[in-house]
């Protein structure tokens, strides 16, 4: 046993003196490898030169020594890892009070969705629209009830809407239409002309859809507002042609259905491939949205139109991007392309 104690003591001393991982692994192989010294001692137990009692006693002692060696090895390995980490932290130390530094190559461009948002707001601002904002976590009233969306409407299904865990009374807003409701409640009296951009959330994710995306919705409420080319059609047609910088761009309004507008329409533009492409939805504000239980605007006196567009989709069209997910990957090589 004295020989065993001597070997393990030498091994532990060698482990503690190791200066790097390479030396440490060599020491482990010398003592615990297939031909290591402690491994060799275990093999002597089966040479037939010991009685069963001696083999049991000496074997237990050798295993105890192996465990001591392994404990010392683990401690040294952890110490070397810690020393390596501290050295790296010291080398990469950053004073967070220092001013920020520009990205390599002077990259200062805004995100393409932000650039698209700014362009949309700029165009509508030029037509007299005010920017409005609201919370992203909405209650059932503002997100559904006030917009004439009944309790059994498919949009309320959990597979389409993210519910907040508070008894299913709040949701991550599924559109920016609640901003319009809040604005009308605060404004009280028309005329109202707003554009409401922001993040919205729906349970969807693929090359052309994201669970979080960006919308911009417009609202115009005043006496005598109509769907005709003097009002809704005129505003959106002018906007879409100026956005894509094409005075000859063909625009069509295709009958559709939305709970909060009547009549309603999908808006299409003619693509470069000669096919119609959907870019938004619109319609005349449903009289139920104006009623006393909602925003208390007299539907006999006032009319209004609303429209909505997907900013991410507009960015894809503007910059010829075919996969929506590229906007959320934070790849600088991709983002540097946009000015």
UniProtKB/Swiss-Prot annotation:
Its cofactor is: Mg(2+)
Cofactor note (record): Binds 2 magnesium ions per tetramer.
Which InterPro entries does its entry note? aa-tRNA-synth_II, aa-tRNA-synth_II/BPL/LPL, Phe-tRNA-synth_IIc_asu, Phe-tRNA_ligase_II_N, Phe_tRNA_ligase_alpha1_bac, Phenylalanyl-tRNA_Synthase, tRNA-bd_arm
What domain of life is recorded for the organism?
Bacteria
Quick one: a GO biological-process term for this protein?
phenylalanyl-tRNA aminoacylation
**What does the record give under GO molecular function?**
ATP binding; magnesium ion binding; phenylalanine-tRNA ligase activity; tRNA binding
Has keyword Protein biosynthesis? Answer: yes
- Which CDD domains does the record cross-reference, listed alphabetically? PheRS_alpha_core (cd00496)
Q: Where in the cell is it found?
A: Cytoplasm
Q: Which residues bind Mg(2+)?
A: 262
Q: Which family does it belong to?
A: Belongs to the class-II aminoacyl-tRNA synthetase family. Phe-tRNA synthetase alpha subunit type 1 subfamily.
Subunit-level organization: Tetramer of two alpha and two beta subunits.
Please name the PANTHER family in this protein's record.
PHENYLALANINE--TRNA LIGASE, MITOCHONDRIAL (PTHR11538:SF41), PHENYLALANYL-TRNA SYNTHETASE (PTHR11538)
**What is this protein identified as?**
Phenylalanine--tRNA ligase alpha subunit
What is the species of this protein?
Answer: Neisseria gonorrhoeae (strain ATCC 700825 / FA 1090)
């Amino acid at each position: 046993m004295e020989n065993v104690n001597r070997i393990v003591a030498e091994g532990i001393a060698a482990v503690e003196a190791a200066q790097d991982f390479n030396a440490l692994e060599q020491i482990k192989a010398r003592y615990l490898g297939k031909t290591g010294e402690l491994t060799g001692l275990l093999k002597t137990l089966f040479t037939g030169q010991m009685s069963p009692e001696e083999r049991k006693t000496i074997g237990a002692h050798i295993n105890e020594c192996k465990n001591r060696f392994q404990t010392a090895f683990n401690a040294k390995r952890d110490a070397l890892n810690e020393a390596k980490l501290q050295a790296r932290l010291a080398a990469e130390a950053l004073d967070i009070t220092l001013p920020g530094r520009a990205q390599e190559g002077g990259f200062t461009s805004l995100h393409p969705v932000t650039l698209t948002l700014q362009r949309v707001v700029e165009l509508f601002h030029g037509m007299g629209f005010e920017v409005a904002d609201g919370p992203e976590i909405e209650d059932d009233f503002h997100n559904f009830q006030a917009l004439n969306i009944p309790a059994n409407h498919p949009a309320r299904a959990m597979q389409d809407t993210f519910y907040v865990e508070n008894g299913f009374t709040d949701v991550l807003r599924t559109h920016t239409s609640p901003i319009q409701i809040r604005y009308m409640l605060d404004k009280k009296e028309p005329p109202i002309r707003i554009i409401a951009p922001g993040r919205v959330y729906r349970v969807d994710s693929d090359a052309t859809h994201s669970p979080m995306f960006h919308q911009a919705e417009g609202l115009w409420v005043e006496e005598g507002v109509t769907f005709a080319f003097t009002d809704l059609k005129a505003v959106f047609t002018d906007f879409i042609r100026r956005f894509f910088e094409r005075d000859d761009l063909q625009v069509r309004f295709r009958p559709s259905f939305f709970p909060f507008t009547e009549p309603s329409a999908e808006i299409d533009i003619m693509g470069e491939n000669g096919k119609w492409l959907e870019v938004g939805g619109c319609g005349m504000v449903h009289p139920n949205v104006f009623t006393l239980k909602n925003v208390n605007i007299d539907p006999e006196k006032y009319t209004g139109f609303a429209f909505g567009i997907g900013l991410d989709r507009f960015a894809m069209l503007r910059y010829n991007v075919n996969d929506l997910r590229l906007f959320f990957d934070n790849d600088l090589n991709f983002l540097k392309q946009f000015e």
